[in-house]
């Protein structure tokens, strides 16, 4: 009898081909949606991001059928910060990370409840919208106007974004979140695009990578966030010249050892196989990297017992590295994994569903506009 996927022997040597244990990763993501280790308790206010890693991971593995989509959709909508009846909290709207405030369960079917400490978080709005699209929702209960108003309130004068209205760190991560939100809602009125573009451009460092902000150290994660944001805006080649793009390409391609690191002289880490790999894909030079070494590194961090991936070999797996490890393998067209949309960070199937959704909105708006013209005449 042939060995099953989980029983096949494998080696860890550089020259041996390691197995991708798909079924174990499916079970790992299932557990992330059901019960989490105690060490995750500090992430309670960011629970929606963990849900994103698990749901998008299952989507990448074509295994969303193992979850109750309707229940999760209702839970996500219950995290939407809606306008109150007097609309006094528009600048605080979006999605919160979990039900930590104890506000009554409301899956976006009634007006919002006023609470002095309740507000959306830019990363939770990004992951919340992503999860809804991944699960096949049509976003009909998303208050788009309020989400965009809340997003506009988070942009600072230098073009960057903070996470919450009370103020927080402001850097390239949140510029990317804002770009994804506008792209998914098909409405760029949520930001001053010119200011955001200037912020990205000013973040280019002396060594040609992109930093979290002007004058800071280049980083693989912030380079992805900046380049992906410009791609979502459709502005990449307007912002950087061909010469500058070639320099960015060189900086990125120099990040590979076997896997990728995020900064010079730092250890290789599984997640950068996506952050840097996706940037190289967007810059159209990923094909010049060493796929075999990258694949072997990612799979060396795979937990063969419980599933998932860690940042380093012989470390504990976690939801973030499990997801980005799979996305990194997807860039190399690993068997059993769906294709990833490198800028939006979801499966291409989900990005195509989103495109169809945008088209349906456009058709609906055109029809409504025609009806209004007919009534007025």
Swiss-Prot record:
SUPFAM superfamilies assigned: Terpenoid cyclases/Protein prenyltransferases
Gene Ontology molecular-function annotations: CAAX-protein geranylgeranyltransferase activity; protein geranylgeranyltransferase activity; zinc ion binding
GO cellular component terms, A-Z: CAAX-protein geranylgeranyltransferase complex
Cofactor(s) for this UniProt protein: Zn(2+); Mg(2+)
Gene3D superfamilies named among the record's database cross-references: 1.50.10.20
Intervals holding PFTB repeats: 144-186, 193-234, 245-284, 291-333
Keywords: Magnesium, Metal-binding, Prenyltransferase, Repeat, Transferase, Zinc
Biological process annotations from GO: protein geranylgeranylation
Cofactor details (free text): Binds 1 zinc ion per subunit.
Residues reported to bind Zn(2+): 269, 271, 321
Enzyme Commission code(s) on record: 2.5.1.59
Main EC class the enzyme belongs to: transferase
Positions of geranylgeranyl diphosphate binding: 219-221, 263-266, 272-275
Reactions the enzyme catalyzes: geranylgeranyl diphosphate + L-cysteinyl-[protein] = S-geranylgeranyl-L-cysteinyl-[protein] + diphosphate
InterPro entries for the chain: GGTase_I_beta, PGGT1B-like, Prenyltrans, Terpenoid_cyclase/PrenylTrfase
Function recorded in the entry: Catalyzes the transfer of a geranyl-geranyl moiety from geranyl-geranyl pyrophosphate to a cysteine at the fourth position from the C-terminus of proteins having the C-terminal sequence Cys-aliphatic-aliphatic-X. Known substrates include RAC1, RAC2, RAP1A and RAP1B.
Subunit-structure text: Heterodimer of FNTA and PGGT1B. PGGT1B mediates interaction with substrate peptides.
Family to which this protein belongs: Belongs to the protein prenyltransferase subunit beta family.
Name of the protein this chain belongs to: Geranylgeranyl transferase type-1 subunit beta
Organism: Bos taurus (Bovine)
């Amino acid at each position: 009898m042939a060995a099953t996927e989980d029983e096949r022997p494998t080696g860890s040597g550089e020259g041996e081909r390691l197995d991708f244990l798909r079924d174990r990763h499916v079970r790992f993501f299932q557990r992330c949606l059901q019960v989490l280790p105690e060490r995750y308790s500090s992430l309670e206010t960011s629970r929606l991001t963990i849900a994103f890693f698990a749901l998008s991971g299952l989507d990448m593995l074509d295994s969303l059928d193992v979850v109750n989509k309707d229940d999760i959709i209702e839970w996500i909508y219950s995290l939407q910060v809606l306008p109150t009846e007097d609309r006094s909290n528009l600048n605080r709207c979006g999605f919160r990370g979990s039900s930590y405030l104890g506000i009554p369960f409301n899956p976006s079917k009634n007006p919002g409840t006023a609470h002095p400490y309740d507000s959306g978080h830019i990363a939770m709005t990004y992951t919340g919208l992503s999860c809804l699209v991944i699960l096949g929702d049509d976003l009909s209960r998303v208050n788009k106007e309020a989400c965009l108003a809340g997003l506009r309130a988070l942009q600072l004068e230098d073009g960057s974004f903070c996470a919450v209205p009370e103020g927080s760190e402001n850097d390239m991560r949140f510029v990317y979140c804002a770009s994804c939100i506008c792209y998914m809602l098909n409405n760029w009125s949520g930001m001053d695009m010119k200011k955001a573009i200037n912020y990205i451009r000013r973040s280019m460092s002396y060594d040609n990578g992109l930093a979290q902000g002007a004058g800071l150290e280049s980083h693989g994660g912030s380079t992805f966030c900046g380049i992906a944001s410009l791609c979502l805006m459709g502005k990449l080649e307007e912002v950087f010249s061909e010469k500058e793009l070639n320099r960015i390409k060189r900086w990125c391609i120099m990040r590979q050892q076997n896997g990728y690191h995020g900064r010079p002289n730092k250890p290789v880490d599984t997640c950068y196989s996506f952050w840097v790999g996706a940037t190289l894909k967007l810059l159209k030079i990923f094909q010049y990297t060493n796929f075999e070494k990258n694949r072997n590194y990612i799979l060396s961090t795979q937990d063969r017992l419980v599933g998932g991936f860690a940042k380093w070999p012989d470390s504990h797996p976690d939801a973030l590295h499990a997801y980005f490890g799979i996305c990194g393998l997807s860039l190399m067209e690993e068997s059993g994994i769906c294709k990833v949309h490198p800028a939006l960070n979801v499966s291409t199937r989900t990005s195509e569903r989103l495109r169809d959704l945008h088209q349906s909105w456009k058709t609906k708006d055109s029809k409504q506009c025609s009806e209004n013209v007919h009534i007025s005449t």
